[in-house]
Design a protein with these regions (language model features):
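Conserved PLP-enzyme active-site core in the AAT-like
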Residues: 2-220
Length: 220
């Protein structure tokens, strides 16, 4: 995909029909910034927001309340969480979310634009994190350092539905090898270096937090 927004949008549209309800947290990038799937002229989906707890993690009790009271087509999570200062959702919470969604027969999509930052920070393997979601989008053009591109990982059968939505959104690209090559290099060589990326973010937050007219949101 040329962008993470298009990757998320294609996946969500592949799960849902117009008018269906999608669970997102109240500060999620898909909900506050991307918005495509909730646009009345495009996605036509209805957002249902769940709360974050005091640690900026998905509130399981609020999730259960919504799932018990409404018909939900898809549950979306974000890891790391952009607007919460890059909060990492630990595997224990992801497992609990997955089990809760499975109880109600609801698939889980993860906006993992900076997933590998979370993987490095938590000291886990990407495969461990991804086993608790049905699909995940991640960017290779952020901390990983590639010039452009995002990927969606899911089952082979579901990927065909996503490709159809990508085509409708104008995302099919020709001669894409020139951007695939640096992405492959990034995934092979740059994941461990995200520890530097995380440290730089924490350092920047520490230096900025006491400046006048500057606010650092959450624990970076």
């Amino acid at each position: 995909f040329p962008s993470g927004t298009q990757g998320n949008t294609s996946a969500i549209l592949a799960y849902c029909r117009p008018g269906q309800k999608v669970m997102v947290d109240e500060m999620q990038h898909i909900y506050l910034s991307e918005k495509v799937v909730f646009d009345p002229s495009i996605g036509q989906l209805e957002p249902v927001t769940y709360k974050l707890d005091q640690d900026n993690l998905p509130d399981l009790d609020d999730m259960r309340r919504i799932l018990e009271s409404q018909e939900i087509a898809l549950l979306c999570i974000e890891n790391t969480h952009n607007f919460s200062g890059g909060t990492c959702v630990p595997l224990e919470r992801m497992k609990a979310i997955h089990e809760l969604a499975k109880e109600f027969g609801v698939p889980v999509h993860m906006d993992g634009a900076r997933m590998f930052n979370a993987v490095v920070a938590l000291g886990v393997e990407a495969r461990e994190m991804c086993k608790y979601v049905d699909s995940v989008m991640f960017c290779i053009s952020k901390g990983l350092g590639a010039p452009i591109g995002s990927l969606v990982c899911c089952s082979e059968a579901f990927s065909m539905k996503i490709r159809d939505k990508r085509k409708l959104l104008g995302g099919a690209m020709r001669q894409a090898g020139v951007i695939a090559a640096p992405g492959m290099y990034a995934l092979t060589h740059n994941i461990e270096r995200l520890a530097e990326d995380n440290a730089n973010a924490a350092y920047a937050a520490e230096q900025l937090k006491d400046l006048k007219n500057t606010k650092v949101y959450g624990k970076v």
